Amino acid sequence: MEHKDIPDAQLHQIKGAASASSGQVPIATGSGTTVFGFLDWTQVANKPTSSGYQAKLSAFSSVNQNPSAVDTPLQITFGSAQTTADVSISAAGVITFNTSGNYLIDIFLRFGRSTSAGNAILLNRILKNGAQILNSNGVILSAATQTIPFSAAIPLTMAAGDTITMEVARDSAGTNDGGLFVVSPTIAGWNIVPSATVVVNKFVDGA
């Protein structure tokens, strides 16, 4: 009878199986024998990988950002300077890409106004290497102490050395009021609501 034809009930178990614990597997020793043990992740030679976006930098501003006058853009800042291998940001809000690739830029802005009568028209835009990309974004605030949050996820292909900046402006068709506002919770243990936040993600191919 060939070995392949032996019924399962008559087959011998692998040597060492009788004393192995539940969940242990046979592991080759490299010397022609096997032992039973729990497989450690470090022992896996061909580990599975995954592709997708990974966060490379996150920054936010904890101060209000108000243009000085109508039709006078203000460059948006995101707190202190930071540097990573793939991307860096200056205290002036200039995002510099240190490596080329496909990026996803998440931005969160909180438009607001505090005083004055009439409608306040607030605009913002994104610039790549100093030139505007995409359409402008805007809100009209008709009441004092009004705030409106805005967020967007923007996919961009960037080369090493490319920069991204953002601006906010008060349009002269409206009143000279408003900008990006911070909200400070009075509830103990709650973090502030920043005036502006940016998260830079890079696509990583795990293949």
How should each PLM-predicted stretch be described?
Residues L11-S22:
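Disulfide-braced loops of extracellular cysteine-rich modules
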Residues V25-A28:
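Small-residue hinge/turn detector
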Residues F38-K47:
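Short acidic, low-complexity intrinsically disordered linear motifs used
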Residues T33-G37:
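Short, disulfide-bonded extracellular cysteine-rich repeat modules
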